[in-house]
Amino acid sequence: MKLHELKPSEGSRKTRNRVGRGIGSGNGKTAGKGHKGQNARSGGGVRPGFEGGQMPLFQRLPKRGFTNINRKEYAVVNLDKLNGFAEGTEVTPELLLETGVISKLNAGVKILGNGKLEKKLTVKANKFSASAKEAVEAAGGTAEVI
């Protein structure tokens, strides 16, 4: 067996169907496009959502909602992520960014109560959920809003 003798196993590769290459192929002549009409022409076809001139569904339905330009998006950290820090550490947004717990500061950091905190930590963040604040204090640490 040499490299040039390698072949894929029988039936593992299917040959591509080349359309418009003779009647005998079964896909010659019209090449699967049918007879005449917009879709048979080169470059033919209609844009997505086009309904033959009828008002399209997306235009028949009303617009809804708006984007609040003053929206604040906080970087979210759950309690179980804080277990990676040593006992007694002061956890700040800068430290979370440095250690890769969060990738961006955004509008600040919000601590959420998912998971269980097993260490006594001083956590400084822009926001805390009620359950997160409770859990930090229950573990003997402090939760400071900055």
Curated annotation (Swiss-Prot):
GO cellular component: cytosolic large ribosomal subunit
Annotated Gene3D superfamilies: 3.100.10.10
SUPFAM superfamilies in the cross-refs: Ribosomal proteins L15p and L18e
PROSITE patterns hit by this protein: RIBOSOMAL_L15 (PS00475)
Biased composition (Gly residues): 21-31, 42-52
Keywords: Ribonucleoprotein, Ribosomal protein, RNA-binding, rRNA-binding
Region called Disordered, residue ranges: 1-57
Domain of life (superkingdom): Bacteria
UniProt keyword Ribosomal protein present: yes
Pfam families in alphabetical order: Ribosomal_L27A
Function (record text): Binds to the 23S rRNA.
HAMAP family: Ribosomal_uL15 (MF_01341)
Family named by the database record: Belongs to the universal ribosomal protein uL15 family.
Protein name: Large ribosomal subunit protein uL15
Native species: Bacillus subtilis (strain 168)
GN (gene name): rplO
